[in-house]
Amino acid sequence: MALKSKPGIMNITPGSKISVIRSKRVIQANTISSCDIIISDGKISSVLAWGKHVTSGAKLLDVGDLVVMAGIIDPHVHVNEPGRTDWEGYRTATLAAAAGGITAIVDMPLNSLPPTTSVTNFHTKLQAAKRQCYVDVAFWGGVIPDNQVELIPMLQAGVAGFKCFLINSGVPEFPHVSVTDLHTAMSELQGTNSVLLFHAELEIAKPAPEIGDSTLYQTFLDSRPDDMEIAAVQLVADLCQQYKVRCHIVHLSSAQSLTIIRKAKEAGAPLTVETTHHYLSLSSEHIPPGATYFKCCPPVRGHRNKEALWNALLQGHIDMVVSDHSPCTPDLKLLKEGDYMKAWGGISSLQFGLPLFWTSARTRGFSLTDVSQLLSSNTAKLCGLGIVKEPLKWVMMLIWSSGILTKSFRCKKMIFITRISSPHIWDSFFKEKSWLLLFEGLLFISKGSMLPNQLENLFLYTLWSLVKPVHPVHPIIRKNLPHI
């Protein structure tokens, strides 16, 4: 008997096995159409015209006008396990991701102990993640001074690419690189089709600023001016054009860097750029004194800058939107002192990215296909998961409501799933949404309820890359990692 004979999701429960999904709004590439999606053995076997699938006994999920798209892939998540699991761990991070419609994350190489800067450390990370993940997980490696001999072995072990800092990272075990280090690393990566991610801020020669009131956000903002990003982005653009190694600028904050980015792309540089939900949602003018949970690096800038980022995103100069989910324990935020200059920088938004983005994007000329492109397709291409997670091929689907809702809600701590929450940041920012997640044909999450045994249905992705030629293959490690 079909699970549902009429549109709706109210009676579907986690654990239900679905064989047909029917929707009037299925996103495939740049099109939206009415379809019946046929699922067999955890894969989509065919996509038929709406209402054409009439097989007796099919377990049909008819979602009516709800949007069906490939799950969101977030390539910028700091999980911090092992070593700093009290900041964030695989279990809580991946549960939060699932609650936000994210079906895969890519773990950043720093803030865990050890960092992912060697093959040995990478395997330590894999062990820590074993049987803890509620969504698929891939991993970035790290580039630090003098670890160039580890880069190709880490690629062969399965990292999705690499991340480096051009400025102090905040943790001693992940030092920033020099220009000389970058030449060495990029020489190693030539011909691999790997990607190098840059935290793009550079220390610049500037007069020592007057010491202002450290509880005022403007004091912190003045300490990280646009010029630091501009200088770093110019360096990345130059190196990208010189070596023809894929380069990616993470968490772009300053819209003043966009001219450099546009010119580099026009010149043929293999350069991509991301910005974050907090840069698109927050403005420095509205950050109160002492509210250090708003601190991140690069900083949230002014309203005009925010609107320029939105415009660049609409024009295609920025390629994707990510969370840069980077929690820490409350003591490191120095909430009592309210000291922006000394507090740890990082914002938690992992489970709220989709409603944050769509609530603002739909008023600025963005379409539903843009949502899929910016939050799923382009992020998959960046980290190589497009190889194994082609949209609507594997059943890692998100079903959600894009309608205009009149009910806004305040972001209370109780709805946060991440280990450390900052509910005040997202108060009144978005409208309530409901969604379902389908993993390999099995309904995992429905309106907040989760399937408890989801841990056995997932992959840790290790993406093999050979130096000459590059030959990426499918993920080779099941979630239970039996041979590690």
From Swiss-Prot:
| Gene designation | ALN
Q: Which Cys pairs does UniProt list as disulfide-bonded?
A: none
Quote the pathway field. Nitrogen metabolism; (S)-allantoin degradation; allantoate from (S)-allantoin: step 1/1
Q: Binding of Zn(2+) 1: at which residues?
A: H76, H78, K163, D324
Fetch the Gene3D superfamilies from UniProt: Metal-dependent hydrolases
Pfam families according to UniProt: Amidohydro_1 (PF01979)
Where is this chain's protein located in or outside the cell? Mitochondrion
Recall the taxonomic lineage recorded for the source organism: Eukaryota, Metazoa, Chordata, Craniata, Vertebrata
What does the record's cofactor remark say about binding? Binds 2 Zn(2+) ions per subunit.
On subunit structure and binding partners, the annotation says: Homotetramer.
The Swiss-Prot or TrEMBL record lists the needed cofactor(s) as: Zn(2+)
Supply the source organism for this entry.
Aquarana catesbeiana (American bullfrog)
| The protein's name in its UniProt record | Allantoinase, mitochondrial
